[in-house]
């Protein structure tokens, strides 16, 4: 189904992602993000409400075992359209071909006359097509407009019991430490939700590239590519489990990433979806290029650590990718199946570029990484605010509420390459 412009409660999908991220879900689950990502769109919502039900009186010093957590995958490009806009319009332009010369009389490669532009009695273009039109022939830009709309919303909250906590602790300092611990842990919950949102945005994009491979050719089976290059027939299990094979595979992987990074700088039709537009019998294609400083690379970190001695000097230098445009992940979707993804993505309808549909389920066991244009994956922060209630006069507690509204955006017309092992 298409993503709609009304706010969508994304609590369930965010919470499911948090449970997978933290190992609460014992195995990887299929995540349906078909109405989560705006293609242009995507977003998540989550917010468990935690209430302190019981408190224990302490006889000694209390230690607050809480430390601040920082969300992963902050490499994703972020924008801020604000609360009063839930649609982003993106306009690109199709490539237009060169035109025939009007400055010469021309022939084709067989010697046959194409256009006679200079001849006695000929005027500007009014010669039955024998000459080219006048200089006033129009050649307007051919635009492509996409709207990335929608809003995913969720709240979070925490309750602080003021009198009870003051009774439970021996001093204002202990009370302050306890309240601070509550707030830090709630902040950690919010950071986990933020990470879940970012992770879901990334997972939808990765699965979408695979699902659209027939039109973008951007999902590369590195096992098949390695075997084709080396003239071997190793399986993924053999490569990952045999040190000699793995060392050679890593060298091939680094080489491949360097080549692909160079290819993305070329203005071409490769590695993205180009919805063809036909005007007057002429087909127009959308060409893209991604300079080095606009490329981002996310890799499965344990594989990258094995390859680090080679990858660092070979890939990350001023001539290739900048290190700040790289991030490693310890797992893609579930800590218990770190290299796997299982997603039903939201993708554009290639038969109707104005529509968004649910794609086919994508289940891959060994994903290595994704190399992409920074504009291909974005998170639109529309609202992020918090408010505190007054103290409840009878029961002496207060609530703090957080409100979130975001939109996750995947643009498959921008360059992006998925690297996996089949």
Q: Where are the model-predicted features located?
A:
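Intrinsically disordered or highly flexible coil/loop and linker segments, enriched in small
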Residues: 68, 188-199, 266, 409, ...
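Mature, Sec-exported extracytoplasmic domains of Gram-positive
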Residues: 28-42, 46-47, 121-131, 219-225, ...
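Alpha-helix boundary/N-cap detector
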Residues: 5-12, 43-46, 50, 54, ...
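Extended oligomerization regions of viral-like shell subunits
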Residues: 235-373
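Loop-centered beta-sheet repeat module
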Residues: 185, 196-255
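Assembly/oligomerization interface modules of large self-assembling protein complexes
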Residues: 52-158
């Amino acid at each position: 189904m298409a993503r709609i412009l009304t706010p969508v409660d994304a609590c369930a999908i965010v919470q499911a992602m948090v449970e997978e991220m933290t190992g609460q879900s014992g195995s990887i689950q299929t995540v349906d993000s078909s109405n989560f990502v705006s293609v242009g769109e995507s977003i998540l919502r989550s917010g468990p409400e935690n209430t302190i039900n019981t408190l224990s009186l302490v006889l000694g010093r209390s230690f607050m075992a809480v430390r601040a957590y920082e969300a992963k995958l902050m490499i994703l490009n972020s924008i801020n359209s604000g609360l009063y806009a839930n649609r982003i319009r993106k306009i690109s332009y199709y490539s237009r071909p060169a035109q025939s010369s009007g400055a010469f009389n021309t022939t084709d490669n067989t010697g046959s006359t194409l256009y006679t532009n200079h001849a006695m009695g000929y005027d500007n273009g009014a010669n039955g097509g024998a000459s080219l039109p006048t200089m006033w022939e129009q050649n307007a830009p051919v635009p492509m407009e996409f709207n990335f709309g929608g809003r995913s919303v969720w709240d979070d909250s925490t309750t602080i019991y003021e009198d009870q906590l003051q009774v439970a602790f021996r001093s204002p300092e202990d009370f302050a430490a306890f309240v601070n611990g509550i707030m830090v842990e709630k902040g950690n919950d919010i950071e986990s939700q933020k990470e879940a949102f970012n992770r879901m945005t990334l997972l939808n994009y990765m699965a979408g590239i695979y699902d659209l491979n027939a039109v973008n050719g951007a999902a590369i089976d590195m096992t098949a590519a390695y075997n084709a290059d080396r003239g071997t027939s190793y399986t993924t299990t053999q490569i990952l489990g045999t040190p000699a094979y793995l060392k050679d595979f890593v060298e091939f992987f680094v080489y491949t990433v360097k080549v692909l990074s160079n290819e993305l700088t070329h203005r071409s039709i490769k590695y993205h979806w180009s919805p063809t537009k036909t005007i007057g019998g002429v087909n127009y294609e959308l060409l893209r290029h991604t300079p080095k400083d606009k490329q981002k690379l996310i890799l499965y970190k344990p594989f990258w650590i094995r390859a680090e001695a080679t990858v660092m000097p070979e890939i990350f230098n001023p001539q290739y990718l900048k290190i700040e445009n790289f991030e490693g992940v310890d797992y893609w979707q579930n800590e218990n199946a770190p290299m796997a993804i299982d997603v039903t993505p939201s993708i554009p309808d290639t038969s109707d570029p104005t529509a968004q549909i649910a794609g086919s389920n994508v289940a891959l066991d060994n994903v290595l990484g994704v190399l992409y244009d920074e504009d291909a994956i974005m998170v639109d922060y529309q609202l992020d605010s918090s408010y505190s209630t007054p103290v409840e006069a009878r029961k002496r507690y207060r609530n703090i509420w957080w409100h979130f509204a975001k939109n996750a955006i995947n643009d498959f017309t921008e360059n992006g390459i998925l690297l996996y092992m089949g």
